[in-house]
UniProtKB/Swiss-Prot annotation:
UniProt protein name: Acetyl-coenzyme A carboxylase carboxyl transferase subunit beta, chloroplastic
Cited PANTHER family: ACETYL-COENZYME A CARBOXYLASE CARBOXYL TRANSFERASE SUBUNIT BETA, CHLOROPLASTIC (PTHR42995:SF5)
Quaternary structure note: Acetyl-CoA carboxylase is a heterohexamer composed of biotin carboxyl carrier protein, biotin carboxylase and 2 subunits each of ACCase subunit alpha and ACCase plastid-coded subunit beta (accD).
Protein family according to the UniProt entry: Belongs to the AccD/PCCB family.
Alphabetical keyword list: ATP-binding, Chloroplast, Fatty acid biosynthesis, Fatty acid metabolism, Lipid biosynthesis, Lipid metabolism, Metal-binding, Nucleotide-binding, Plastid, Transferase, Zinc, Zinc-finger
Pfam (any one): Carboxyl_trans
């Protein structure tokens, strides 16, 4: 049975992360009663490693065994408070055990010998750390920073806690995670003067891509700050990095799930697939093979999903492009599906939402892909000008090329996500063509908003509420119960 060992520094004696320590030996009652709790040993005590004779007794768990299984299967954590009191916490999910010990082991010596320069205040390790072992090489500590960042990310994502970074040392950044304990009423209260402190060397994390690849089934790395994010928690965070706020790409299926009320989504034209109309020649990979591999990778037939559903009870027609399918490129199938969606919305007098995420027209289909720009713009003109219906365009990163030049910028209301890359031609193409440098950030959503090309920049979390208010402002209201078919 393999164990993993992690080193944590707790800034308060009471360990409140998912459990609460009671100083009373007589009281033992779960804080949150659940039918599926982790089995714990009531005889286990947390003894003080200092000179005091007091100790903490009994652990009341706030997490079910189901939650822990999603996190970790068999692991041991070393915990130390601000008074250098040290404890060992062991999880064995298979046998449903949760044990806390205070026995010093070689592994504890190994991890406790790891100190940052600011924590030691530039003093000698041998003078300040009784457990310091000079025979242990510093190279062994590289994985500790990586694992600390993994657990650090999980704490924030699954336990309703927030964080910010402070840097008071040249050698490392300290991550102070402020614990928010969820009360029974569902409200979040902040535990006063409590924080979990982990040491994380950001430069080591950026360089250590090999370790990240070994855990890629559990963690995903932010493209901006290179922080590790727990994959299962990423969906609940709407694919937003909790460290730097960077907006990671989100699949079309996940976006539909976030936007449309459960059980109301009705897809359209799912059986429409691309062919090779111009017999495009490629030295690397045939066009049809690329389509087949993209279909296997995404589970989609092409780079857009269209259909109807309800957004907070309001019937809408929705089209969502998926960048994972050949860069969200617009071919004949994408153009036809969007055209049919607009025509259906025109007939049924539905408000229209198109979520753009595309690299532009699909070059493998030549002029057939370019004509989709005119075809979609034509039906949009009838939808907006003749029928006086309401179209919202949502631009995500990246939105470029033919999509930007056509329906992407034709919305009655144009909304962009924060930091979205929106352009007609990419930075590299412009610089190679015009021989001029493109200013940094000039193609970001914030720059376009200042220049009047966008109506608003809305984060993912409040987007559904903003869309609801816009629809109600334009006289689109939720269906009554009697009107729901």
């Amino acid at each position: 049975m393999e164990k993993s060992w992690f080193n944590f520094l707790f800034s308060k004696g009471e360990l409140e992360y998912r459990c609460e320590l009671s100083k009373s030996m007589d009281s033992f009652a779960p804080i949150e009663k659940t039918t599926d709790r982790v089995i714990y040993d009531t005889d286990k005590n947390l003894y003080d490693w200092g000179e005091r004779s007091s100790y903490y007794n009994n652990v009341d768990l706030l997490v079910s065994s189901k939650d822990i299984r999603n996190f970790i299967s068999d692991d041991t954590f070393f915990v130390r408070d601000s008074n250098k009191n040290s404890y060992s916490i062991y999880f064995d999910i298979q046998n449903q055990k949760f044990e806390i010990d205070n026995g010093l082991s070689d592994l504890e010596v190994f991890f406790y010998s790891y100190r940052s320069s600011s924590y030691l205040n530039n003093r000698s390790k041998s003078d300040n750390d009784p457990h310091y072992d000079p025979s242990i090489k510093d190279t062994k500590y590289d994985c500790n920073n990586h694992i600390n960042s993994c657990i650090d990310s999980y704490f924030r994502s699954h336990i309703c806690i927030d964080s910010h970074f402070l840097s008071d040392s040249k050698n490392y950044n300290e991550s102070y995670i402020y614990n928010l304990i969820c009360s029974k009423s569902g409200k979040i209260r902040e535990s006063q003067n409590y924080k979990i402190r982990t040491n994380m060397n950001r430069s080591d994390l950026i360089k250590d891509f090999d370790i990240t690849q070994n855990y890629n089934q559990l963690w995903i790395q932010c493209d901006n700050c290179y922080a590790l994010i727990y994959k299962k928690a990423l969906k609940f965070k709407m694919n937003v990095c909790e460290q730097c706020g960077y907006y990671l790409k989100i699949s079309s299926s996940d976006r539909i799930e976030l936007s449309i009320d459960p059980g109301t989504w009705n897809p359209m034209d799912e059986d429409m697939v691309s062919t090779d109309p111009i017999q495009f020649h490629s030295r690397e990979e045939p066009y049809q093979n690329r389509i087949d591999s993209a279909q296997k990778k995404t589970g989609l037939t092409d780079a857009v999903q269209t259909g109807t559903g309800q957004l907070n009870g309001i019937p809408v027609a929705l089209g969502v492009m998926d960048f994972q399918f050949m860069g969200g490129s617009m071919g004949s199938v994408v153009g036809e599906k969007i055209t049919r969606l607009i025509e259906y919305a025109t007939t049924e007098f539905l408000p229209l939402i198109l979520v753009c995420s595309s690299g532009g027209a699909r070059m493998q289909e030549g002029s057939l892909s370019l004509m989709q720009m005119a075809k979609i713009s034509s039906v949009l003109c009838d939808y907006q000008s003749s029928k006086k219906l309401f179209y919202i365009s949502i631009l995500t990163s990246p939105t470029t090329g033919g999509v930007t030049a056509s329906f992407g910028m034709l919305g009655d209301i144009i909304i962009a996500e924060p930091y979205a890359y929106i352009a007609f031609a990419g930075k590299r193409v412009i610089e190679q063509t015009l021989k001029k440098a493109v200013p940094e950030g000039s193609q970001a959503a914030e720059s376009l908003l200042r220049k009047g090309l966008l109506d608003a920049i809305v984060p993912r979390n409040p987007l559904k509420g903003v869309l609801t208010e816009l629809f109600q402002l334009h006289a689109f209201f939720p269906l009554n119960k009697n009107e729901i078919k």
